[in-house]
């Protein structure tokens, strides 16, 4: 039974950092990197005294497999359980998750962790994240509880990294537009103002 349930993750115990490390391997074209928390240390004068450099551990999947998984993850956000992870102008890949908590004594109540793992942009990832809700009060999954948080984080990260949004036609048509104030203007003035605003 354990071997069969392992295929959908119900017998394996992972830490969040292990899950993120695997997610990053998918984002990195299949190369597993040693995880680290501190990027660099600066002294009181603002000089960098220590810089962490990424360390490759090994290749765990092929680049082709990595690309296919990223495409499937994008499909989870575009058409699947991760729709709430969508961010207009950015291609987000994601995977919703529900985990059963392992404990020696839980009584009769099974406890869960819900999650959403995301990468962005999915075609050339710069950011990977894992949003977790431990023992949610509501009977909702990672797509409902965690994906909206991931969308907010992705949007901020993309802005901080100066990654410009690239809107498809549908997204462009749904963008809000600023309309000039036309109240109290004559028809001629209103028309000129509207034309000046490309309306």
Regions found by a protein language model. Give the residues of each.
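A short beta-alpha structural unit
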Residues: 54-58, 175-177
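Active-site beta-strand/loop architecture of penicillin-binding DD-peptidases
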Residues: 1-56, 73-162
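Short, conserved, surface-exposed binding loops centered on an aromatic residue
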Residues: 59-60, 193
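Glycine-rich loop/hinge motif
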Residues: 164-199
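Extended, non-catalytic substrate-recognition/exosite surfaces adjacent to catalytic cores, especially
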Residues: 66
């Amino acid at each position: 039974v354990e071997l069969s349930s392992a295929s959908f993750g119900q017998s394996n115990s992972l830490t969040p950092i292990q899950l993120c490390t695997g997610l990053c391997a998918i984002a990195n074209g299949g190369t597993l990197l040693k995880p680290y928390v501190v990027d660099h240390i600066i002294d009181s004068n603002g000089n960098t005294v220590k810089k962490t450099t990424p360390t490759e551990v090994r290749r765990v999947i092929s680049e082709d497999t990595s690309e296919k998984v990223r495409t499937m993850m994008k499909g989870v956000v575009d058409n699947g359980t991760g729709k709430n992870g969508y961010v207009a102008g950015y291609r987000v890949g994601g995977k919703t998750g529900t985990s059963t908590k392992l404990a020696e004594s839980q009584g009769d109540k099974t406890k869960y962790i819900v999650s959403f793992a995301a990468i962005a942009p999915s075609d050339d990832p710069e950011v990977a994240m894992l949003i977790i809700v431990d023992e949610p009060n509501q009977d909702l999954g990672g797509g409902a509880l965690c994906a909206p948080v991931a969308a907010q984080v992705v949007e901020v990260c993309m802005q901080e990294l100066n990654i410009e949004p690239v809107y498809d036609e549908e997204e462009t048509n749904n963008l809000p537009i600023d309309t000039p104030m036309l109240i109290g203007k004559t028809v001629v003035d209103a028309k000129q103002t509207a034309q000046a605003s490309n309306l």
